[in-house]
């Protein structure tokens, strides 16, 4: 985070946080560890500044069970009545659509602050801090804490550690930079409980989630000589095994681990009524294959080079055809 643009943006966000008193913290629907860790860390950061802030999450899906150990009791599922009086502070949201029902707060909010690490971020904020080479949004929040002259606390460190460890895949993904590892050491030294985080996030598995995983693995198919692995989950699967949509998180990592796979895709039908009809998660095993470009080609998606997703109204066979075509194009670009 040493580029002149990043330094300028960091200072601008810090100034916006200092100069306002009331905030609405928001992250993307179907949140992952980076989203939840970042929003909690931002809440603790604003508390330390003496600010009034509330956390909000769009959608009706329950929080993933693995994150219930976090201090998220104050997380609201309905927008507060005083939205027009609060700065909208968006974290880990690549674009407005990722806010879900929270998009309704964009217009009345006096100021929109956008902090994110997705390289295709639409920069929808009045004040933007987008650092594409950051390992996680949590890493950027740590730099904000430093810019504001605040000290790390064990609670803040643990929230940031959750963001960091999950978005780097337990420090295995290509975004595990030297800075990310130095940050991990700092957070542990400050008091982040590594064992508690590991047990909660990675060893808390509901039986329904295992049954959902079994169905996805049973349906997995390989295409294009084994370079593309695709599976799917139906709305009825969630109902029959008693699973909520967040239970599907992490399944795609098993698909990506298939020998020879360059691109993995999990198509799922959200169990809740309404749109979209289907969501698709994408993962690549190499930084050479940009899955965010595939997600954008769908017309309703985006993300990182190695982890992205999109929504679709197409039927599953049509989505598979789209993925096969896009995979071949992406592979040709990568090998050109």
Tell where the protein language model's regions lie, with residue ranges.
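Hydrophobic helix-and-loop "lid/oligomerization" segment in the mid-to-C-terminal part
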Residues: 2-29, 37-65, 84-85, 166-298, ...
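Solvent-exposed alpha-helices and their adjacent loops that cap or buttress functional pockets
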Residues: 16-17, 80-83, 104-107, 121-122, ...
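Short glycine-rich anion-binding loops that position phosphate/pyrophosphate groups of nucleotides
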Residues: 30-31, 93-96, 118-120, 235-236, ...
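Short, glycine/charged-enriched secondary-structure capping and boundary segments
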Residues: 38-41, 69-71, 102-106, 127-130, ...
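Active-site donor-binding segments of glycosyltransferases and PAPS-dependent sulfotransferases
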Residues: 57-58, 62-79
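Active-site cofactor/cluster-binding pocket
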Residues: 71-127
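Short alpha-helices
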Residues: 115-184
């Amino acid at each position: 985070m040493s580029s002149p643009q990043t330094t300028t943006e960091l200072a601008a966000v810090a100034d916006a946080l200092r100069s306002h008193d009331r905030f609405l913290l928001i992250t993307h629907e179907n949140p992952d560890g980076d989203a939840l860790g970042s929003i909690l860390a931002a809440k603790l950061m604003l508390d330390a500044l003496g600010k009034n802030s509330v956390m909000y999450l769009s959608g009706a899906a329950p929080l993933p069970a693995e994150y219930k150990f976090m201090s998220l009791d104050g997380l609201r599922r309905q927008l507060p009545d005083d939205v027009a009086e609060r700065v909208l502070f968006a974290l880990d949201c690549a674009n407005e659509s990722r806010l879900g029902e929270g998009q309704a707060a964009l217009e009345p909010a006096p100021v929109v602050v956008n902090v994110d690490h997705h390289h295709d971020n639409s920069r929808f904020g009045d004040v933007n801090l987008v650092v594409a080479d950051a390992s996680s949004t949590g890493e950027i929040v740590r730099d904000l804490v430093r810019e504001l002259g605040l000290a790390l606390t064990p609670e803040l460190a643990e929230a940031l550690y959750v963001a960091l460890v999950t978005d780097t895949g337990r420090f295995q993904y290509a975004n595990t930079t030297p800075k990310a590892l130095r940050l991990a050491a700092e957070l542990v030294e400050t008091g982040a409980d590594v064992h508690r985080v590991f047990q909660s996030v990675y060893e808390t598995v509901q039986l329904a989630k295992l049954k959902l995983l079994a169905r996805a693995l049973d349906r997995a198919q390989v295409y294009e000589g084994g370079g593309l692995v695709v599976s799917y989950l139906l709305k009825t699967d969630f109902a029959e095994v008693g699973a909520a949509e967040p239970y599907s998180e992490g399944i795609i990592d098993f698909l990506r681990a298939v020998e020879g796979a360059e691109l993995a895709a999990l198509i799922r039908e959200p169990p809740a009524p309404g749109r979209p009809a289907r969501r698709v998660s994408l993962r690549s095993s190499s930084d050479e294959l940009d899955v965010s470009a595939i997600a954008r080609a769908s017309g309703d998606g985006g993300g990182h080079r190695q982890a992205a997703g999109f929504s679709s109204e197409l039927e599953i066979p049509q989505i598979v055809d789209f993925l096969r075509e896009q995979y071949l194009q992406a592979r040709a670009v990568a090998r050109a």
